[in-house]
A protein has these predicted regions:
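Short, compositionally biased "basic patch" segments
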Residues: 1-14
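Long, amphipathic alpha-helical "stalk/connector" segments that mediate intersubunit docking
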Residues: 3-4, 27, 103
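N-terminal first-folded block
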Residues: 14-48
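Positively charged, polar, low-complexity stretches
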Residues: 22, 33-38, 55-81
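Short secondary-structure boundary segments
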Residues: 50-51, 75, 96
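Short alpha-helical
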Residues: 54-55, 98
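C-terminal structural segments of small proteins and small subunits
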Residues: 79-107
Length: 107
C-alpha cells in the first residue's frame, strides 16, 4: 500500500471509487462490455479498470473510436470497482457529462 501511495495511485482510485458510487446512486452508469457497447451513443465517456484484459481493452477502444467517445483507464482494479458497484466489471459507461468530467480529470 505504501508503494502505491508514493505513486499517487491510491488517492486517484479512492476519488474514482467515490465518484462511481455517486454515479451508481444517480443511475448514471452502464456496466459490462455488451451493455456498454449497446448504450455507447448515450455515454459521456467510458472508464476501464487497470486490470482489464488487453483483448477487452482493444475491443472497447475500437467501439469508443468508432463512436467518438473518450476512453479513460483508471488506477482501480475490477475488485475495487466491485466493492462499490456490487458487480465485478472492468468496463463502465458514464452517462452524465459532468460526472464523467469529474472522473476523467484524475487521469
Amino acid at each position: 500500500l505504501n508503494s502505491d501511495l508514493n505513486q499517487g495511485k491510491v488517492p486517484n482510485c479512492v476519488n474514482t471509487l467515490n465518484t462511481l458510487g455517486l454515479c451508481k446512486r444517480a443511475g448514471k452508469i452502464v456496466t459490462g462490455f455488451d451493455a456498454v457497447v449497446s448504450d455507447i451513443a448515450k455515454a459521456a465517456g467510458i472508464l476501464i479498470a487497470s486490470d482489464l484484459s488487453e483483448k477487452s481493452k482493444k475491443e472497447i477502444a475500437y467501439h469508443c473510436n468508432k463512436n467518438n467517445k473518450t476512453l479513460v483507464e483508471t488506477d482501480c482494479t475490477m475488485s475495487q470497482i466491485e466493492g462499490v458497484l456490487n458487480k465485478r466489471t472492468g468496463i463502465i459507461a458514464i452517462l452524465d457529462g459532468g460526472l464523467f468530467k469529474s472522473l476523467s480529470r484524475n487521469y
